[in-house]
């Protein structure tokens, strides 16, 4: 056994409370090194005749990445506390792995050998809103979705879709335009809208906030926003707003006061200022987002700033009943601020969704005291590299997805915000080189994966564009310019996701990933319900054997409704280039 690859720690993604009664435990071992693992566990105070009393249970291998295998066990400690270790088997070799190291036999004279989960406290639970697990999100960049009220469009706005956008161009998109097209979203199957910032700002993107308590007048007013949210709720759609608390805009009144009054300004400590007077060249002498002078960084450790921003967060929940906050540049704000943020917004609306924009490993923010989820860019990276760019093989892709899933606890994965693209990335059809078949595979995997999927406006009809600002083109409303086949594909997948709980909440298992032909087989399982997904990510027809003994069941093609009895031990399906199929497995 390769001892140096064996790893566990009683915290985070390796040991966590799944609910108020259940503990999840994981173990990492070298890939293909261990035959089986047993969990050794017991109450730390359960002793008889000088020996600690423990039980043994098998652990289940839940997946592998490029280097490691991952093992899993679920325990319900009767007294909500646990001491535990692992017994590993490889051929004739046996090792006991504990917090103090490795042993050949199980130590029973002292529980101090073992890993400890001291007590399962409900207050320590990671609990994301349950509704998020069933939500299909739709991200809207308000300035480019629809112009419902031309009378409030900014001066110099261009005719809708008349030209490609620039960083400073306006086309007049607004909140009324979103209201006017809610039926389109309902028909698609959308149950959550994520709006990029809507607060007063001089830019088209609104990430340089001037007033956090006012709707930008070119988007509408508070009454229009209230109407939008009420209409959404009537139609079963949740609404999430975007908060920019890392930095403000140049026109934010406190920053203007500092710019005018310098060191004598009462707001000077609201920002991270290195010296006075303020200057922007060659670089700002105050902290900013990136090095953008128009986006000064807020000092969230300052009690006045903290109170101001927390009041902003609670105001829009209390007065407008929003359902979530997406938090921009969340990783550059101190953890203490986010802990207080969570306490205040959850006290007001316990099932509000808190989503952080973090592009890297975000475990420090996902321990139950800060965020409910982060934007799952590691997922995005993997699916684009496999389906769109064809940079990695099927096995490498399966490994990467398993690494993503094992980086976080299961209850974190269930609420993860899974996106294919956004206002910060190139359009997926552009990344796919214009190949709609690849885009279909992207949506198929996204809408059958664990977590909460988000569609960037227009991707479902085949809009194109490179990085910002090209990815922020006006929504195409002319039916003749929309890809109806792609739209129908997305609509059908969303409907299937709603119909089959396993597609929303089931555990994913990769059954086979073929590097030679680049096909992928995985299943989603929830209780007795199983859906099998088979994908051919190659430009050649593939005859694919199904590594699943399904004898005694019906295989129902969810795309066509056809069904056939699985009577043979080995089944096979034939798929065209970039083809796919979904089977529900139903018992006779």
Swiss-Prot record:
It catalyses: Hydrolysis of pullulan to panose (6-alpha-D-glucosylmaltose). Its cofactor is Ca(2+). The active site is at residues 328, 357. Binds 1 Ca(2+) ion per subunit. Ca(2+) binds at residues 147, 149, 153, 172, 174. GO terms for molecular function: calcium ion binding; D-glucose binding; identical protein binding; neopullulanase activity; protein homodimerization activity. InterPro entries: Glyco_hydro_13_cat_dom, Glyco_hydro_13_lg-like_dom, Glyco_hydro_b, Glycoside_hydrolase_SF, Ig-like_fold, Malt_amylase-like_C, O16G_dom_2. Its EC number is 3.2.1.135. The record marks 424 as: Transition state stabilizer. Substrate binds at residues 247, 326, 423-424, 468, 472. GO terms for biological process: carbohydrate metabolic process. Keywords: Calcium, Glycosidase, Hydrolase, Metal-binding. It comes from the Bacteria. It is an enzyme of class 3 (hydrolase). Homodimer. Belongs to the glycosyl hydrolase 13 family. Hydrolyzes pullulan efficiently but only a small amount of starch. Endohydrolysis of 1,4-alpha-glucosidic linkages in pullulan to form panose. Also cleaves (1-6)-alpha-glucosidic linkages to form maltotriose. This is Neopullulanase. It comes from Geobacillus stearothermophilus (Bacillus stearothermophilus). The lineage of its organism: Bacteria, Bacillati, Bacillota, Bacilli, Bacillales. The gene is nplT.
